[in-house]
Amino acid sequence: MDRFYSLSHSSIDFHFKQTPRDFVVEEVPLYEFCGEGEHLILFVRKKGISTLELVSMIAKYLGIKNKEIGYAGLKDKHAMTKQYISLHKKYEEKMDTFEHEDVKILSKTYHNNKIRIGHLNGNKFYIKLKKVNPTSALKIDEALKNIASFGMPNYFGYQRFGTDGNNHIDGELIAKGEKKERNPKVRQLLISAYQSHLFNLWLSRRLEINSLIQNFDVKELEPLLNIPQDELLKMKSQKHPFKLISGDIMEHYPYGRLFEFIGEAHDFDRFNAKDISVTGLLCGKKAKHSTGLSREIEKDFDDEINEDGARRYAWVFPKDIDGRYKDEEAQYELNFYLPKGCYATVLIEEIAKRKIV
């Protein structure tokens, strides 16, 4: 899908390919490991293989089932990644002799529980952009400063939608009972892609509204957006690039309870201070809906499917952003941290202001 971007610069030309040399990910765990307990915790570096391939490889080596190995999240295949896995410590001695050319065990410790999906705070990234000229490097500098100050939209990345980008199409058919999928994991993957697609469409629409708010007068906007003048004036006065609308569902950041935004001044301040953020809908049962004007926009991207829904941060705040231009190599290197569930490729696309695949 074509989408709106949050930054105002023109698109930046550079080369990016997701390879282990140019794309490095390091997992940041949810908690410190205590150093004792029946679970062996391995910090593993891998390149060119997915998390599930790593798990299958180790399970086969140990003669155990894949489900006996714990991990917090799925890491990219086309990258150099460092992540934690857990298994019973009775396998420690055999793992001491485990060898693979694309896998290295960097360290080990112990803990009193198995690592499970979601047991991570986020990920640290190192990324290299190539064929960058000095003018583009300056534009990248400014884009990173803007993201460091205000944050960025939390789109689902292209990886969510499969190699052909069409997983959401099958997901919609399955969710509506028009197509069958016997494998429960594949079924859930495809339906999630459909939910993610609707979320991305909604987020792009909100960014389009932001752009219109910034570039047109209130008198021009009222008939264009069908939003009352007093609400448009409130949106115009907001300093943040993502304009909050009455009825938005907010969430304490980086985690916490949901609550409804009713336009109170201290909530604008908390959003600017990165203490709260706005959420978008992942359609389905049990999901909290926005209200009022916000719901008028959201309902066009909702679908009453018989699956559990949720809210997802629509706007996130990357941390520890650092960029360096290497003139002689025409390369730009950047480091940053993203909370779990966020895509580094989305940040790169925000900088480029275009698709990168």
Swiss-Prot record:
Gene3D superfamilies: TruD, catalytic domain. It catalyses: uridine(13) in tRNA = pseudouridine(13) in tRNA. One of its GO terms (cellular component) is cytosol. GO terms for molecular function: RNA binding; tRNA pseudouridine(13) synthase activity. InterPro entries: PsdUridine_synth_cat_dom_sf, PsdUridine_synth_TruD, PsdUridine_synth_TruD_insert, TruD_catalytic, TruD_pseudoU_synthase. Residues 151-331 form the TRUD domain. Pfam families: TruD. Its EC number is 5.4.99.27. The active site is at 76 (nucleophile). Responsible for synthesis of pseudouridine from uracil-13 in transfer RNAs. PANTHER family: TRNA PSEUDOURIDINE SYNTHASE D. This is tRNA pseudouridine synthase D. It comes from Sulfurimonas denitrificans (strain ATCC 33889 / DSM 1251) (Thiomicrospira denitrificans (strain ATCC 33889 / DSM 1251)). The lineage of its organism: Bacteria, Pseudomonadati, Campylobacterota, Epsilonproteobacteria, Campylobacterales.
